């Protein structure tokens, strides 16, 4: 049978848009993905490159869940802690993404600043620290209130913001054990640590009053070396702020630099000490009551440990381990190591997680888990894995570019994922991961066959985007690769119609096509003349159209336009668009989806008979899908329900899945009172069902298990409903809400 991706797309898409309505897509984490016999816990969790973790109770079950913040993408990834003793088990919970502020940047920290039992949220904001109070309640669930966009401190006779850089993450801790939160942050030079002590309890007796004053001395009396991630300790110290109480005053002179002959050669101007890029954590490593330090830094790939031999009121760094933990396998991250200290495996002991703070680091083996094998008073960390949490995801390094294609010609669409590259300590090489569709009946699932399909890594490419179609007219589908340099590469399929594909390199720099940078091709009969044309996205965000002026057997792709349809998905003022086209047919008419660097998907119509004109932009936020950065969509029916689904790749190397509820379609005239949210999901005790709009109409609410057995039924017009599911059997359930016209269904997991 002829296998042509163009016709696969047409076959999959055409039936789904009845009555001129758009389908409703919802984020789906239920479809199984296997690596060997191991079922991935969070396959559709969008991947991780730059990892900034924080503890927070998302669902009010008094267990610390997990927030992962990807700063370059401005994206939060929440995970529910299943709370199994001695087990690290977290389930991706994207329904909580909307609960977090959308303006967080740089880094995220959590700390219960008002000591009410709820972790509050802190983030970078314009050279300072913004703070959001956690106002969780059973009625609202997780709710953040902005308290200040710039935490203030007293510098002697004046008050100003606590200076923090976007790339220098501070430490939040009750350093002196007086019941309020203190702040440690690197100075504007990035060389020493400033101490902003809270005097809230002293002045008001209320830790939430947020009163800070600057202690004008290097906290711990150390500074970072100018060319490596290590510290210069007393008594050998370069320039640092001076106060009379400083016991090492003899080694400081703000006006003249170092005066002691022993250190005079180290730094006379202090200029060599300046740098930016640190991730700071403090904790009591040895149980002596004061706070020790972990620091990852742009000055080195190591993790630095600094021992505090002082007191809670007067820190004094006396020793260091520059390859921490040197007693085990040391932590090493190519760029900036980001340490985190929290209980990973629910044994009561806080563990060590080391991730990437900057996006230029390793993008695959990039989250190190060290188990605390002793206790919180005498911490000993033992390395467990280099891929904590990410080993449960579809994760292909940097950039995920999915496409559906029947690789083995068994009649089921497989999932191929190209990438920008995998980056380790020295190389950046792109590959293609092949996930075979191993579904049985209507139960969808995918299994990884190889992460280097057709050994494409041997060609030393970067930025691989795939498209398939019968280019040579022999009845099987050939492969064209878009390359980061803007060119195309043609691989001929030698297998013959109906046989598993065998791709052989036929032509580099295919037909001398060059669109500049980051070519994203789609083979499609654009002008409906029966021949495959080429539609090519690119870095700037426009679309290029190459018409096939040859034949179905011997194509000649001739340039027509580099402004096809007037499409440009780059944001105003940006040159980064990274357009990813999907041209498809709906009810006999062509429509177009275009992924973008911003994370949104654009939807266009008015294409037929208008190839030289400007298309109609229907939506610049298709289905409200937002997957920053570099949203790369692929479309197919993956669960056998005759409705199209979307898989969207992103810069962080993972993919997310959106499936369609056939019982619900959306148009601009529709009443949205039936739309509802379920949380927490997964759930253990109480399930909240919250409707997005009030309604006087009574709706039928039914919950069934995976066998179809009805376990709950209610008719209600309430906007908020709470169900006790504590005694329900663990498993997957469907919550079905119906009115006189429509039915809307969502899945949830009881554990």
Regions found by a protein language model. Give the residues of each.
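Hydrophobic residues in alpha-helical membrane-spanning segments
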Residues: 16, 298, 582, 681-683
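Sec-dependent signal peptide recognition
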Residues: 3-10
